Amino acid sequence: MIQEVPPSPPDARIEQDFQRDVWCLFGLPVDNLTLEGTKHLLRERVKLPYNTVLSTINVNWVVQSFADPAFRAAIINSDIVTLDGKPLLWLAKLLGYPMTETVAGSTLIQELHQDKTTDTKLSIFLFGGEDDAAAQAAKEINKNPGGLYAVGSLNPGFGTVEEMSSDVIIKTINQTRPDILLVALGAKKGTQWIERNRGRLEAKIISHLGATINFLAGKVQRAPLIVRRIGMEWAWRILQEPKLFPRYATDGLILLRVLVSRFLLWRKYLYLMTKTRNIPVDTSVSSCEGEQELRFSFGKNLRLTKDSSFPKLFLAFATSRKTITLSFKQTEFVDGAIAGLLLLLKKHQLKNKNSINYTQVHDKLNQIFTLLGFSK
């Protein structure tokens, strides 16, 4: 068993983070959630005294995260991250991850609105979009009563993130006290705006779902279900909006180049995963605690799928408020779930302005981290 680490009183948000079933994909923490599970989770989160940031990532988000550390950090700092698009789901399955379906933001909002059986309707504020799309989307939502009702909309026009973060804009949103704040400012600008203002916003769920406003407003027709099921929604979007073709082509080529460069690492990962599958999971940990630092040495085979006590250990790390030094001298294999926990730990160490160090990481383990996109 893992050696107990005396934790500090856990912050509720940190404790909640380490209860996630999260996996590292291209260096991003992706939650293993179904559409129904996500709907239920959001309905529970609106009851909490603090807000929740939801990110639904597609190929474009992944590609942008390669080159933009701030954008990557914004995704990592989200409280829920789901896969929006079949290509990412297929790639997750190639790594042996347990995800079974995508959770696209537009589908999620549509499903929440079409749920007319719920006793508790959720209020939604629409922020951004082109021209009058947000106002039109609000009208369409209220014209067809369901699980959502619109309490306001605002198009801030063109401007910087700072200009869109004025007291007047934040007050306009907050006075409606929405359960859901749907943001559509472009992926990078939208996530930056959320990162900057989440502490000032009184919305319970905050999410950048760019195209969703256009779908709700009826300005763009969503792909038929069969097209979405076979992973061809991107082709439908191009037919609807030809201006998207350059972006889709560029994103596809960049992702393909990354996949080709990591093909051999993927083969080695599958080999190591098979080779160590029947080896007992050694979760023994040796630790040394100082006044300002905690040092931990992990065992040989780190698999969350075979030992569910890891999240409790990582929670203790995150709530220690100390510098954390992790030694991987004996470690031969780390699964995507452990890498996901490492992402969360790094996030909270940075938020708490504490350091995290990784020592004695040998070549095989470095190759696994490179494949999964985990940056030390």
Regions found by a protein language model. Name each.
Residues D84, T176-D179, E293, S320-T323:
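Short acidic/histidine-rich motifs immediately flanking catalytic phosphotransfer sites
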Residues N58-V62, L185-G190, T212, Q330-E332:
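Short glycine-rich anion-binding loops that position phosphate/pyrophosphate groups of nucleotides
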Residues I2-S106:
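N-terminal nucleotide/polyanion-binding subdomain common to many enzyme families
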Residues I75-E140, N144:
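Portal/gating segments that form or line small-molecule/metal binding sites
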Residues P87-A92, R222-Y271:
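A transmembrane-helix-recognition feature enriched in membrane-embedded lipid enzymes
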Residues K268-S297:
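Short beta-strand/loop segment at the start of cytosolic alpha/beta domains
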Residues F125, A135-T176, V183-F215, K219-V220, ...:
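Internal alpha/beta domain cores that form substrate/cofactor-binding pockets in large enzymes
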Residues N301-K376:
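Amphipathic alpha-helical interaction surfaces in cytosolic regulatory modules
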